[in-house]
Amino acid sequence: MTARLYGKGREGFLGGDIDWDADIIKVVAIDTANYSVSIDADEFLADIPAAARVSISDALTSKTKALGVAGAANVVFQEVTGADIEAIALYQDTGNEATSRLIAYNDESADLPILPNGGDINLNWDAGVNKIFKL
């Protein structure tokens, strides 16, 4: 499950505004019926309409960055209800959706779409060489 990087996310890494190790990084589960990605224009979580946000994870743990490849422990979305999940996006959580920078987007995982049923949803990152994403 290799993700595409948002242009502004890439800019954030290069400008030193995103610190993979120190920053709070979360994952938003997305209903694409309410969001059309603009990989180079979308910048902040606020660019993903609230109606498209099916669930948000806790902060990523056990983050790694060897050789420019981002990795982390698998994610659990808890007690998810609502629309089908057709995509996910990683973002730097500042506590304010207007400044929480989007990092990566994935709508091509073999695990998608997911139909929530009120239970937990496990998101397992790719164990291969590209893990979550590669800079």
Q: What do the predicted segments below correspond to?
A:
Residues M1-E86, D93-L135:
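Small cysteine-rich, disulfide-bonded extracellular modules of the LU/uPAR three-finger superfamily
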